[in-house]
């Protein structure tokens, strides 16, 4: 059986470092199973400092989920003319026409992991692990609605960007780090 569209080369080759913002972005989808149902998160993560540039959360892992996230990410670089490499796994979401046309229209560069090789997107997987260890696993979600859970994930990501310190950033959050460098409002 043929592929949806040809996969681009793996341009990152597990080099998740970037010396400035908006050079390398990572994306993927993760699933949360709570008693009320399944919820999916699609973030765009900047390799410069781990900032979650944009994200979408929904109840279906579909094209709308990833396209909404990509549109929001593109808006963050439109004014500066940034053209990051966008690295993903080989999921169909990243190979459908809607995704491809958005990438092409914004003049972004596609990169994909090798087939079945999750370490090729390890930094994104690491973010998912951190989020689940800090937010998801410690709590009982039994009486939580889908809407409440989505709000909790959204709040976590905002907290992560604004307040969660990282040793690699000199004990600053991504936004604090950027402010310290004079590259964030």
Where are the predicted features?
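Charged DNA-binding/catalytic regions of mobile-element recombinases
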Residues: 1-185
């Amino acid at each position: 059986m043929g592929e949806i569209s040809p996969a681009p080369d793996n341009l990152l080759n597990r080099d998740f470092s970037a010396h400035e913002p908006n050079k390398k972005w990572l994306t993927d989808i993760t699933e949360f199973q709570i008693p009320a149902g399944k919820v999916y998160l699609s973030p765009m993560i900047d390799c410069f400092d781990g900032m979650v540039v944009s994200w979408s959360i929904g109840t279906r892992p579909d094209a709308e989920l990833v396209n909404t996230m990509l549109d929001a990410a593109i808006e963050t670089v439109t004014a500066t003319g940034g053209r990051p490499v966008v690295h993903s796994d080989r999921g169909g979401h990243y190979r459908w026409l809607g995704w491809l046309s958005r990438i092409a229209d914004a003049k972004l560069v596609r990169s994909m992991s090798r087939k079945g090789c999750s370490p090729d997107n390890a930094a994104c997987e690491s973010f998912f692990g951190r989020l689940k260890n800090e937010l998801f696993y410690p709590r009982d979600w039994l009486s939580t609605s889908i809407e409440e859970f989505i709000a909790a994930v959204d709040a976590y990501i905002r907290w992560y960007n604004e307040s969660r310190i990282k040793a690699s950033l000199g004990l600053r959050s991504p936004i604090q780090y950027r402010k310290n460098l004079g590259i964030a409002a």
